Amino acid sequence: MMPRDVRAPTIPVPFHKLLKVVAIVDAADLQTKQLLDHIAAENFEVHVSGSFDRDVSEDASVGAYIVLVDGDRLEQARKFARSVRAIGFQTPLWALADSHRISDLAVLALTGEVDGYVYLGQQTPAFYAKQIVASLVKYGLSLLPPFFGGLAAYDGEANITFACPGHQGGQFYRKSPAGQLFFKHFGENVFRNDLCNADVDLGDLLIHEGPAAEAQRHAAKVFGADTTYFVLNGTSTSNKVVTNAVLRRGDLVLFDRNNHKSLHQGALVQAGAIPVFLPTARNAFGMIGAVDWDAWDEDHLRERIRTNPLVKDSQRANAERPFRLACIQLATYDGTVYNVRKVLEKIGHLCDYVLWDEAWIGYNAFHPLFEDHSPMRLEDLGPQMPGLFSTQSVHKQGAGFSQA
């Protein structure tokens, strides 16, 4: 496989098409105008404004800011810089000042808050434009996650394949009037980047190498997991992967009655595990609620094993960890969400593993509202706690494309 460094692509990523420059400056100043003209000559979109009044959180397409800090604008510039950093953006910030202010301590107080200074008259506008564009490109490369970065680098090389998919980069659609409409509606890039998995330049999910494997490791870090695997067909297939990997015929599985049918298929039909069902609440309006709290009680669960007609050996109820796996719908279809820590305090020591179906709550690891409601974010778990699985559908509550 050809090594591909996402941070140093063979063909430069066309950031001039992807990121813009925002200049909060005096556009009437001749040298400032020359600076902006040089940036525009590199085909970058340049937005000029005289006011710091802008909602930076609403415009994530900015690749660099140039802000005038002369006179009474200094404090406004500092507040603006802090507002950019406060939302987590690391967008390059350049402070623009007259050359006579190079020793002005007030301007130097911006050190650490901006990425560089533009002292018009000290260097040429062309040189400063190069510096700003270089910082934008470096910033753009830092934004690229492993797989998309590899894909952008691959696309930049204008590779062509004669394998599948049969639309051949969208060229098939261009051969008919209806196809032309389809092609133009989506644009060429979506077809050029629809690649066959046999094209190993972007890695291989089956043997876990290249950008695909790097993306899995990156996702694990982002979500707080030890390991992450990408699976086609969402949570349904992920549930079957986990249950078939963990369970074998005759194992006991603690089973939420709210579980999706994929868990019924994977755990009970395919793996052949024996369910101990957890009763769930349903109000007078038919809304699905949580498992009855008393049903998590250890004595109650062991008694359910003893009285289960499918369990032939009643002594299994006395095992230290009678359940090979617990399958729990973390968020019901009607919005009930479990406190994961509290549930694990009740049943964790009874299970080897717990699978949390997060199909409808894939965002819980990223908001303080859901503290203790995300399995991957739990800390300070004791030695009695089981192994934890989370299964998700990026195309449901994440931002992934829908699946056919």
What spans do the regions from the language model cover?
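Terpene synthase/cyclase
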Residues: P125-R192, N197
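Conserved acidic segment of CheY-like receiver
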Residues: P9-A40, F44-V48, D55, V67, ...
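Conserved PLP-enzyme active-site core in the AAT-like
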Residues: S49-S51, R82, Q90, A106-V107, ...
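A short, well-structured beta->alpha microelement
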Residues: V6, L36-S61, L74-E75, E298-S314
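Conserved phosphotransfer microenvironments
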Residues: L30-Q34, F52-Q90, A97-L105
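Structural motif
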Residues: A23-L30, G50-F52, I66-D72, L96-H100, ...
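Conserved N-terminal alpha-helix of the aminotransferase class I/II PLP-enzyme fold
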Residues: K184-S238
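Alpha4 helix (beta4-alpha4-beta5 surface) of REC/receiver domains from two-component response regulators
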Residues: H100-G116
